[in-house]
């Protein structure tokens, strides 16, 4: 005799068959029940096998910027000119206070050294711009503060040159 269990609450898979044989009536010993459970496992092709998640692809590396991108508006030129103006204003102020000579007189005394300093600072300022590195903030030294200070230094250095050119004497 075969039983088919199709109840969803049974522990045997749906569609499984159970063979049950009744014990003979003439036995003297206690009747033994022999049960065989035949369970069939099927592969369901409609569901894909679980796969381990693959790591996301690395982000594409950005292409190196072109010279026109770096030298564009609000790019490297303003930062470089601001840095050179800060350097020039502080150096001119210190030299005027120590020697009493005007900036134009000092420029006439050492033109090669001053030009070399400006070229080196310009090249050093271009390297991070071509590497697409943005300035990090370190305390009060933020990129916005550098831009603001550079703008004031450009105005101050230009005003000092105009004053000394008109008056012919050192400002400080």
Curated annotation (Swiss-Prot):
Annotated membrane-spanning segments are: 111-131, 152-172
SUPFAM superfamilies xrefs: Chlorophyll a-b binding protein
Biased composition range(s): Pro residues: 46-63
Q: How does it sit in the membrane?
A: Multi-pass membrane protein
Superkingdom, natural source: Eukaryota
GO cellular component terms, alphabetically, are: chloroplast membrane
Disulfide bonds listed in the record: none
Which InterPro entries does this entry report, sorted A to Z?
Answer: Chloroa_b-bind
Please verify whether the record's keywords include Plastid: yes
Chain residue ranges for the region called Disordered: 41-66
Give the subcellular location: Plastid, Chloroplast membrane
* Keywords, in A-Z order: Chloroplast, Membrane, Plastid, Transit peptide, Transmembrane, Transmembrane helix
Q: Which family does it belong to?
A: Belongs to the ELIP/psbS family.
Q: What does this protein do?
A: Putative zeaxanthin binding protein. That forms photoprotective complexes within the light-harvesting antennae.
The protein's name is Carotene biosynthesis-related protein CBR, chloroplastic
Species this protein is from: Dunaliella salina (Green alga)
Q: Name the gene that codes for it.
A: CBR
């Amino acid at each position: 005799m075969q039983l088919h269990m199709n109840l969803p609450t049974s522990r045997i898979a749906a569609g499984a068959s159970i063979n049950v044989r009744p014990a003979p009536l003439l036995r003297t010993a206690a009747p033994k029940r022999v049960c065989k459970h035949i369970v069939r496992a099927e592969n369901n092709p409609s569901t894909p096998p679980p796969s381990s998640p693959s790591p996301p692809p690395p982000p594409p590396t950005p292409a190196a910027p072109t010279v026109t991108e770096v030298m564009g508006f609000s790019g490297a030129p303003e930062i470089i000119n601001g840095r050179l103006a800060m350097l020039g204003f502080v150096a001119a102020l210190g030299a005027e206070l120590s020697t009493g000579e005007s900036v134009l007189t000092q420029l006439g005394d050492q033109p090669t050294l001053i030009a070399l300093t400006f070229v080196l600072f310009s090249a050093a300022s271009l390297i991070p711009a071509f590497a697409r590195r943005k300035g990090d903030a370190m305390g009060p030294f933020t990129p916005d503060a550098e831009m603001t200070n550079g703008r004031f230094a450009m105005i101050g250095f230009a005003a000092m040159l105009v004053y000394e050119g008109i008056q012919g004497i050192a400002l400080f």
